[in-house]
């Protein structure tokens, strides 16, 4: 085994690889406030149209650098190697926007599909009945849906999305009753959406869907250290007796809220400044979304 690993490191081959983690460029239809142009073609276009935003992302980006998943070479590579897979993870961008995804997973022989697990991370702006029908032949399919709060909070954070569309698509997939589908929520724990966690948890408790927490690391000014102590204490008090479906999620948020209970006002100022800058471009107002008590500076 050691010799095999050394050989793979010095001269890697794909002929025996069974697990693939594919980040499919930056093709995306949303402009999430915590994201960047390398993961969203919409953010890249927005930054190029509004040069004042380029400093937000550390400089300019060229879309041509992220278009490689559209190339014939990569599509042919997928068609050659994915049929041997027992695990494939698709992220983006937004993987369900990639036009050849259905053909790629259909190219896997049926006997191999029965051994293969698929995993998609998606904003669920679009649902392809054709793709979901093909999922039934696989061993298991994980769908992780990115959600930041509810209603206007989600729409502000995942700019370009509609809460009504998300709700409709969640319901549509649930009603398909795909036995091998594991359908869960990903939530980024961060300052701009922190106030909506309680309502979001209640919403997904009712849908019987579990929430997986992702602790935000970048941009650092959206870290929950930017929140007031008062806002975090309110969450802790409100969830002290919570025993619902998403107890593990709530325990995680409680833990990090306690760990970062004190406010870092430098981050608060940077958070407000960044959101204000973005609001000027998008004609939004974060003050309509985030309660003043959450980001006030005494």
Model-identified regions with their sequence ranges:
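N-terminal pre-core extensions flanking Radical SAM catalytic domains
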Residues: 1-65, 81-82, 248-298
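Core AdoMet radical
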Residues: 17-27, 38-69, 83-98, 111-128, ...
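Alpha-helical packing segments of well-folded alpha/beta enzyme cores
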Residues: 20, 74-77, 104, 166-169, ...
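Non-transmembrane alpha-helical segments in soluble domains
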Residues: 32, 79, 102-106, 171-174, ...
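Extended amphipathic secondary-structure runs
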Residues: 74-103, 284-285, 289, 295-298
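Leucine-rich repeat
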Residues: 75-81, 105-111, 134-136, 173
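Distinct, well-ordered alpha-helical segments
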Residues: 100-107, 129-136, 196-198
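Conserved C-terminal portion of the radical SAM core fold
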Residues: 119, 140-144, 164-297
């Amino acid at each position: 085994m050691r010799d095999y690993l050394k050989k793979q490191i010095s001269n890697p081959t794909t002929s025996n690889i069974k697990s693939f983690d594919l980040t499919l460029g930056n093709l995306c239809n949303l402009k999430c406030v915590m994201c960047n142009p390398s993961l969203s073609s919409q953010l890249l276009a927005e930054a190029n149209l509004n040069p004042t935003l380029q400093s937000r992302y550390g400089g300019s980006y060229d879309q041509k650098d992220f278009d490689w998943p559209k190339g014939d070479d990569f599509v042919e590579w997928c068609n050659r190697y994915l049929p041997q897979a027992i695990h494939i993870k698709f992220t983006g961008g937004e993987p369900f926007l990639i036009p050849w995804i259905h053909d790629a997973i259909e190219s896997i022989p049926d006997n191999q599909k029965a051994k293969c697990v698929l995993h998609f991370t998606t904003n669920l702006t679009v649902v392809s009945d054709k793709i979901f029908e093909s999922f039934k032949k696989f061993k298991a399919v994980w769908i992780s849906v990115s959600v930041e709060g509810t209603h206007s909070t989600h729409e502000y954070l995942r700019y370009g999305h509609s809460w009504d569309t998300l709700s409709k698509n969640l319901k549509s997939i649930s009603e398909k009753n795909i036995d091998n589908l594991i359908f869960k929520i990903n939530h980024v724990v961060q300052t701009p959406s922190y106030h909506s966690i309680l309502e979001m948890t209640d919403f997904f408790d009712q849908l019987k869907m579990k929430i997986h927490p992702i602790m935000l690391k970048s941009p650092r000014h959206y870290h929950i250290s930017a929140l007031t102590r008062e806002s975090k204490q309110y969450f802790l008090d409100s969830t002290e007796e919570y025993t619902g479906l998403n107890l593990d999620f709530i325990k995680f948020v409680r833990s990090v809220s306690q760990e970062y209970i004190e406010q870092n006002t430098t981050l608060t100022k940077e958070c407000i400044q960044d959101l204000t800058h973005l609001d000027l471009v998008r004609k939004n107002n974060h003050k309509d979304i985030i309660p003043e008590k959450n980001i006030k500076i005494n």
